[in-house]
C-alpha cells in the first residue's frame, strides 16, 4: 500500500506538470472505487485551474478554483502524467485532461478514492476523512521535542502495542507498516511494548527516527513491494536500505543477531530482539 513517502513522491512528480494548468475534461472510466467517484466531476472540474497540490497523510489534495479534489491511492493505485494521445490501459479508472497532458489514476484493485470537497463547505481540514488525522511528521508541530511530547501525551494510558499505536495515525500520520518497523528499530524500541509505557526519552528517539526514516524513504523514491511506481513509472528504492523489514533470519546490520518476525494486528512486524529489548 502506498504510504506517506510514496504519496509525497507522487506529489513531487505531478505538481510541476499540473500546477497552474486548466482542466479541459474529466473521464470516469470506472468509478466503482472504495467510494463511488462523483459523477458530476465531469461537469464540475472542466475550466477549473489546479492552484496547488498538497498532501495530508496519504491523501493528495488538488486545490481547484471552487474546491479540493482528494485522491487516495488505496492498495495498488498510481498516478501518472502522460500525453493525452497515449492509449488507456487496463485498470485506468479516472483521467483528468489538461489539453495535451493527462493525469491518470491506475488502480487494479479499486481500493483508491477520488472525492470532491467544495470550498463552500468550509476548509479542507473539515473534510470528514481528514478530521481525525494526527500531525504531519515534517510540520513545525512535530519538530524537535514537540514531536516527542505529542507521542508521549497521546500514548498515555494506552495498552496497545506501540507499533499499532503508530499505525493508527492519530498521533502522527504516515508511519505505515514498513516505516513503523524501521523507525522502531532506529529508536531501539520493541514493537510490542505498550504505548503507554513509553518514556519521554524513548518518545524523543522515536519522533526523531520517524522523521529520519520517512525523509530517507522520500529521497529513495519510496518503497516498491509489488505495484508502486512514481509519476514517471519508476519504482522506489527504499527497500534496499531497510535494516529489519523483510529481513527475517538475516543478521542484524548492527549486532548480527538474526532478525525476528511476528504478526501484530494482521500486519507483519520485523525487529531485532537484541537491539530492541522489550
UniProtKB/Swiss-Prot annotation:
CDD domains (alphabetical): EcFpg-like_N
PROSITE patterns tied to this protein: FPG_CAT (PS51068), ZF_FPG_1 (PS01242), ZF_FPG_2 (PS51066)
One Pfam entry name: Fapy_DNA_glyco
GO MF annotations in UniProt: 8-oxo-7,8-dihydroguanine DNA N-glycosylase activity; class I DNA-(apurinic or apyrimidinic site) endonuclease activity; damaged DNA binding; zinc ion binding
PANTHER family, per database record: FORMAMIDOPYRIMIDINE-DNA GLYCOSYLASE (PTHR22993:SF9)
Similarity remark: Belongs to the FPG family.
GO biological process assignments: base-excision repair
UniProt function note: Involved in base excision repair of DNA damaged by oxidation or by mutagenic agents. Acts as a DNA glycosylase that recognizes and removes damaged bases. Has a preference for oxidized purines, such as 7,8-dihydro-8-oxoguanine (8-oxoG). Has AP (apurinic/apyrimidinic) lyase activity and introduces nicks in the DNA strand. Cleaves the DNA backbone by beta-delta elimination to generate a single-strand break at the site of the removed base with both 3'- and 5'-phosphates.
Protein name per UniProt: Formamidopyrimidine-DNA glycosylase
Coiled coil: none
Lineage of source species: Bacteria, Pseudomonadati, Pseudomonadota, Betaproteobacteria, Burkholderiales
Subunit structure comment from the entry: Monomer.
Segments forming FPG-type zinc fingers: 243-277
Organism: Polynucleobacter necessarius subsp. necessarius (strain STIR1)
Active site positions, chain numbering: 2-3, 58, 267
Key words of the record: DNA damage, DNA repair, DNA-binding, Glycosidase, Hydrolase, Lyase, Metal-binding, Multifunctional enzyme, Zinc, Zinc-finger
InterPro entries: DNA_glyclase/AP_lyase_DNA-bd, DNA_glyclase_Znf_dom_DNA_BS, Formamido-pyr_DNA_Glyclase, FPG_cat, MutM-like_N-ter, Ribosomal_uS13-like_H2TH, Znf_DNA_glyclase/AP_lyase, Znf_FPG/IleRS
Catalysis: reaction(s): Hydrolysis of DNA containing ring-opened 7-methylguanine residues, releasing 2,6-diamino-4-hydroxy-5-(N-methyl)formamidopyrimidine; 2'-deoxyribonucleotide-(2'-deoxyribose 5'-phosphate)-2'-deoxyribonucleotide-DNA = a 3'-end 2'-deoxyribonucleotide-(2,3-dehydro-2,3-deoxyribose 5'-phosphate)-DNA + a 5'-end 5'-phospho-2'-deoxyribonucleoside-DNA + H(+)
E.C. designation(s): 3.2.2.23, 4.2.99.18
Cofactor note as given: Binds 1 zinc ion per subunit.
UniProt cofactor(s): Zn(2+)
Residue numbers binding DNA: 91, 109, 158
Amino acid at each position: 500500500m502506498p504510504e506517506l513517502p510514496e504519496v509525497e513522491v507522487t506529489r513531487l512528480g505531478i505538481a510541476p506538470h499540473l500546477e497552474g494548468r486548466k482542466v479541459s475534461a474529466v473521464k470516469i472510466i470506472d468509478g466503482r472505487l472504495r467510494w463511488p467517484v462523483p459523477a458530476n466531476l465531469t461537469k464540475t472540474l472542466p475550466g477549473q485551474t489546479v492552484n496547488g497540490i498538497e498532501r495530508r497523510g496519504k491523501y493528495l489534495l488538488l486545490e481547484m478554483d471552487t474546491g479540493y479534489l482528494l485522491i487516495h491511492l488505496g492498495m495498488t493505485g498510481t498516478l501518472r502524467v502522460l500525453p493525452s494521445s497515449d492509449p488507456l490501459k487496463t485498470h485506468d479508472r479516472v483521467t483528468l485532461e489538461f489539453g495535451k497532458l493527462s493525469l491518470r489514476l491506475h488502480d487494479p484493485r479499486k481500493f483508491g478514492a477520488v472525492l470532491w470537497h467544495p470550498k463552500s463547505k468550509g476548509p479542507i481540514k473539515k473534510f470528514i476523512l481528514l478530521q481525525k488525522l494526527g500531525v504531519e511528521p515534517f510540520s513545525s508541530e512535530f519538530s524537535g521535542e514537540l514531536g516527542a511530547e505529542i507521542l508521549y501525551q497521546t500514548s498515555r494510558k494506552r495498552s496497545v502495542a506501540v507499533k499499532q499505536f503508530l499505525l493508527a495515525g492519530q498521533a502522527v500520520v504516515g508511519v505505515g507498516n514498513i516505516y513503523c518497523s524501521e523507525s522502531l528499530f532506529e529508536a531501539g524500541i520493541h514493537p510490542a511494548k505498550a504505548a503507554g509505557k513509553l518514556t519521554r526519552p524513548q518518545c524523543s528517539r522515536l519522533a526523531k527516527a520517524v522523521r529520519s526514516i520517512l525523509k530517507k524513504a522520500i529521497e529513495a523514491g519510496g518503497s516498491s513491494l509489488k505495484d508502486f511506481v512514481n509519476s514517471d513509472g519508476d519504482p522506489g528504492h527504499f527497500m534496499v536500505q531497510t535494516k529489519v523489514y523483510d529481513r527475517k533470519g538475516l543478521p542484524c546490520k548492527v549486532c548480527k543477531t538474526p532478525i525476528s518476525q511476528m504478526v501484530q494486528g494482521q500486519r507483519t512486524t520485523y525487529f531485532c530482539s537484541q537491539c530492541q529489548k522489550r
